[in-house]
Amino acid sequence: MRLKKYYFKRIKSTNDQAAQMIKKGKEKGIIIADLQIKGRGQYGKKWISQKGNLFMSVFYKINKEKNLNFLTNYNCRLVKSALKKFINKKITIKPPNDLLINNKKLCGILQETIFFKLNKLIIVGIGVNIIKSPNVKGYKTTFLNDFTAKKINKMIVFKSISKLFEKNIRFL
C-alpha cells in the first residue's frame, strides 16, 4: 500500500501533526521532519530531537478489534528489521517500544490510537538516533553511525522504514 509522504522542516511533533491530519480526513500517510521541537516519548517523557536524526510518524487505519500489544510488537519488529540492513550488530527490543544496541537506546517508538468518524487509526512515532545521541541522565543512548564504516543519511533510513510499512500494513 502506497503511503503519501509529508515533509516538514520544523514541527512540534510528528505524532501531533499526524493527529491533526487524521482530524482533517486523512486516513494514512508518513510524516518526516528535519527538526522536532516538542517530541515526546512514552508516559509523556520528552524526546530529545537532535538535528540530523530521524523523526517520523506513520499513520493508518486499523481494525477496531486489533490487539494494540500485538501492533506495538509488530511495529517495533518492522523498524528493527529496517535498521538491521545498515549494521551488523544485534538490535534488541526493550518492551514495550525501545530498540537497543549493547543496552543503549538507539530508537524510540511511540504508538497512539485515534478514533475519528467511526474509524480507528494508529499513529506510530519513530525516533532514530542516526548521527548523534542525546545525553540523558540515567539512560544510556547510542546512534546508528557509531556502528557503520560508511556514514548513513537519515533519508536512506527513512526510505527503508517507509518501504517496510508500505509493504506490511495491508496485513493488519
Predicted feature descriptions by range:
Residues M1-K85, K89, C107, K151, ...:
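N-terminal lobe of the biotin/lipoate ligase/transferase fold
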Residues K84-K117, G127:
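Acidic (Asp/Glu) carboxylate-rich active-site/surface patches
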Residues I131-K140:
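Cytochrome P450 core scaffold surrounding the K-helix E-X-X-R motif
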Residues N145:
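Structured alpha-helical
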Residues A149-L172:
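Conserved, helical-rich catalytic subdomain that frames metal- and/or nucleotide-binding sites
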